[in-house]
Amino acid sequence: MIQSTRISMGLFFKYFLSLTKIDPGQNYISLPSIKSSTHIALLFMVSMGTQKLKAQSFFIFSLLLTLILFCITTLYNENTNVKLIPQMNYLMVVVALFFLNAVIFLFMLMKYFTNKQILPTLILSLAFLSGLIYLVETIVIIHKPINGSTLIQTKSNDVSIFYIFRQLSFICLTSLALFCYGKDNILDNNKKKTGILLLALIPFLVFPLLAHNLSSYNADYSLYVVDYCPDNHTATWGINYTKILVCLWAFLLFFIIMRTRLASELWPLIALLCLASLCCNLLLLTLDEYNYTIWYISRGIEVSSKLFVVSFLIYNIFQELQLSSKLAVHDVLTNIYNRRYFFNSVESLLSRPVVKDFCVMLVDINQFKRINAQWGHRVGDKVLVSIVDIIQQSIRPDDILARLEGEVFGLLFTELNSAQAKIIAERMRKNVELLTGFSNRYDVPEQMTISIGTVFSTGDTRNISLVMTEADKALREAKSEGGNKVIIHHI
């Protein structure tokens, strides 16, 4: 077990280092690019497509990934001659964060509109929307031309202020969403719901206004987070602010785990973002001097984590669409096709330019209403599922089996003759009678039988109404003769 774990981790490190670019001349390491991070996210999506991950295992793996990123960046940045990253590169990172936050906001908002009972989802969407405000402010600051050391210090200080308040807004709104998690009484009370939303406006609107006024836009109330040294062209980061952020992220991560137990699909993603932000700020604590390289690395961690969140949300949407498509044409109880799909299939067959031999069967479970009345609907459902399983074992894989209503099923067969249709129908009838007999493996209370009405056509008819009418006549004829029979009509 230990050896296999070492091999797996070795392969992971080998893949990660192949994506990581090290410049020997500059002696520093940069995180994987956005494209490489997408490769990692896609690998996760493929693995999730093959097996359904539990929330706990998903979070543990994300924890290991983020810690590995943190250790690698810290290791390669010790005692290095750090150089400034070009301003345009940093602008690209901020723009990437802007679009990632916008995408996550839209996903969260759409998820809320699909189920307006989930108030925490709406509050979380506001958390990502608030980040867009700070990122717009940051982009405007970066675009300002540099005319001396004073403006460099001002730009660095403003970027730091918006960075701090962006995290504070996210922490406050996430904490409020966490407070509402699992409290249905808030949703039932409109006054409480309105109060919660008004409270959410403080970090959503008041914090950005406060950050704007504490920046260089208002000289009377400026907050100085960064001290610029013109001699060596470095800016010293206020470490106390980082310590506060580290504590807040750590407490938020702890309470998310304790409150939600990572039970839903959404909260493990939020926990991952908290963990990434925690590591970003811890990375800043490990260095004595503020510089754009380390800032760029921390933003790279945030980009990677949010790329993964976006990838998972897209994967989740495709899963829900797949489930919705399946429910649209499948019966919930028996997991076979429903009436709508069956009739569409028959109409599609009859509308072909050339229609070959085909057969439609209607199957009715004899004495099913008595089973429901005597044993209850729970046993009745078990009988339905059992007979469906027996019928599926008696027909070909490409044949269509659908539940039309109650205990009536429809089957559509193609590429067979009348004799083959009779053989299949008799096989179904005998198997149901035999496999539901005494001490059967399906645990149905008594032996069951079915009646089958069959209509066979050589392809001359194109009228679905005629086909279904003849099949229904054959079924009623089989039941009128005592049931447990197969009657075939030809058209």
From Swiss-Prot:
Protein's organism: Escherichia coli (strain K12)
Residues in the Cytoplasmic compartment per record: 1-54, 111-121, 180-193, 258-265, 315-491
Site keyed Transition state stabilizer: positions: K369
Stated name of the protein: Probable diguanylate cyclase CdgI
GO molecular function: diguanylate cyclase activity; GTP binding; metal ion binding
Disruption phenotype: Deletion of the gene increases swimming motility and early biofilm formation.
GGDEF domain span: 356-491
GO annotation, biological process: cell adhesion involved in single-species biofilm formation; negative regulation of bacterial-type flagellum-dependent cell motility
A Pfam family it matches: MASE4
Catalytic residue positions: E407
Record topology, Periplasmic segments: 76-89, 143-158, 215-236, 287-293
Binding site for substrate: N372, H377, D381, R427
Membrane-crossing residue ranges in chain numbering: 55-75, 90-110, 122-142, 159-179, 194-214, 237-257, 266-286, 294-314
Ligand binding (Mg(2+)): D364, I365, E407
Gene Ontology cellular-component annotations: plasma membrane
Entry cofactors: Mg(2+)
Keyword Membrane attached: yes
